[in-house]
């Protein structure tokens, strides 16, 4: 007796389905040019096939080109009208809108197609096209999101929580809207990209609130996903022939978007290592901690230590203003049900990092808090370096604020000029890096950030 299910499994895969699976596999491997050439050749070889098949292949060639432009981020920061009509590159929204319209035509053709010899194909192609319509809409919204992030690079503060909310709403809107097995590589790459970006933005928001464990979990989650994503490029080797014979293989260069996400993760790791240096130091030796922080993209601890040695600073501290923070319990991780009385007085302004000794300079702390209070308006502009000399203790204080809850304090014995260009430049560079908005500027290829 025949088993219908087994017969179905053994039946050869229709050629069209095999072409589609091969195309989306190539797209999932980020072989954009190869995928485009593949469907264009298939279209030329299938001119006698039905109109709906030819139309879908043409749309898929445009999809490969759109995905290449998207992942290389070449659309960011384009000025409309800045180029001549013939040389102006279409915006990413224009490209995906045009693609969306092509796919809608395929859907419409499928609805009006007469019953033919391949009814399954006549059903499959419009169904895939409909799901790809949702995908192109999702891409347009994420591209708009990157445009917004790019413009935020020039601002003093970035509301990461607001960005996470916007990203979450896009994800919920398009969740399971392009779920066909043939599109699984496309769906997977979309999901990983949005997950990584969400976790990194959440991490940025949580570091700014000095929340150790949530920051750590999001940073680790993004790192793990980026590593898995990076394996796709590591496994791809391209052969290069040398001028005088011989050849070598090297990993394929990942697209700009992936490299940018890696850089954002690296800058957040550096900031995390600095803000939570005390908690992390408890897990290893001092020499090992020094080695580990030196490997970060920006070694804040080493940079500040070098500044102290060169300019004979008495102390550099990162002060956390925990007023209004109900969850504040001090360095590291604390059990959710553990109770600790809310800090009062000077304890509302702990030095979460203090160099060179690791302990805040107690005798100077009332002065530090007084300056932070009296000069709060200047500090809240987030680009002002505040100077104060106290004749009684013969000490000079420089203060600057990278973000609302944190203030960098530099203390010198004796008098220092408020016009000391090196000290001011050092602090401005430091708070600019800690603000972590520069990576948003570098979203655009060729930008410094």
Curated annotation (Swiss-Prot):
Example GO biological process term? Answer: cellular response to amino acid starvation
Name the principal localization, coarsely classed. Answer: membrane
Q: Which domain of life is it from?
A: Eukaryota
Keywords tagged on the record: Lysosome, Membrane
The record's listing under Pfam families reads:
C12orf66_like (PF09404)
What's this protein's family per the entry?
Belongs to the KICS2 family.
What is known about what this protein does? As part of the KICSTOR complex may function in the amino acid-sensing branch of the TORC1 signaling pathway.
Protein name (record)? KICSTOR subunit 2
Q: Does the UniProt entry include the keyword Membrane?
A: yes
* InterPro entries, per database record: C12orf66-like_central_sf, KICS_2
The subunit structure is: May be part of the KICSTOR complex.
- Which Gene3D superfamilies has this protein been placed in? 1.10.3450.30
